[in-house]
Amino acid sequence: MGVIRILLSLVSLVFKALDSVGILWDARLRLSEFIYGKHGVLTVRGPTKRILKLPACVIAEYIKKRKLTCVEVIEAFRDRILEVNPILNAVVGDRFDDASEEAQHIDQVLDSSDINLNQEKSDLLSKPLLGVPITVKESIACEGFTNSAGLVDRKDKIASEDAAVVKNLRDAGAIPIAVTNCSELCMWWETTNNVYGRTNNPYETSKIAGGSSGGEGAIISAAGSVCGIGSDVGK
């Protein structure tokens, strides 16, 4: 049994090493190609920036300890979304400029030696998700974004305030950077509608991303978001 445990530990270390350089991502794509054929296979390679592979709690901790700047984090996920979204059609609205401004303010306060900012700095350091970029399902109100739920009659509807879940995450320090596609009125198993079109599966683009939170699932799976807000109407 001791030998088996050692072998399993070695295998685990090998897989972690391969995953850290994106090799497992490519392997999954090659397996998909073998099973389904070359048509529709995702052409975007796995993420190469280390930031994109970090969990939310680690990102927040690194920002607080100044191992990462908040601007670096926001820019990394912005660039990843711009890279993969033309293939996935997962993100249907963004606030990259506003998010960058919020990130710059966080960095300025944390790096400042001004004693007048000590209270604000203390408040920021108490936030568990400080600087973590998040995405939000478009059917969930996020101030300034469309809130159509994929319905043509609501395509010009703009959220005037955040839903409670979005507000709570903002209060915890998270920074919304984009909203994502959903099925029409969140009632279908495929993320497609007549406002934004269909969202594709990151691992096999000829397949669906599921629903109704397929936009969230797709962009998070493609390392374009640390975490996000989805929903399920249940059975």
Spans of features found by a protein language model:
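Conserved hydrophobic/aromatic pocket- or pore-lining residues that grip, position, or stack substrates
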Residues: 77, 99, 131, 137, ...
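Enzymes and membrane/adaptor proteins characterized by extended Gly/Ser/Thr/Asp/Glu-rich
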Residues: 84, 122, 127-165
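A structural signal for the main folded, soluble domain(s) of proteins
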Residues: 13, 17, 22, 28-32, ...
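Immediate post-signal peptide segment of exported/extracytoplasmic ligand-binding proteins
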Residues: 106-132
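Short glycine/serine-rich loop segments
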Residues: 161-235
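Hydrophobic face of alpha-helices
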Residues: 71-75, 133, 166
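An N-terminal boundary/leader segment
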Residues: 1-104, 108
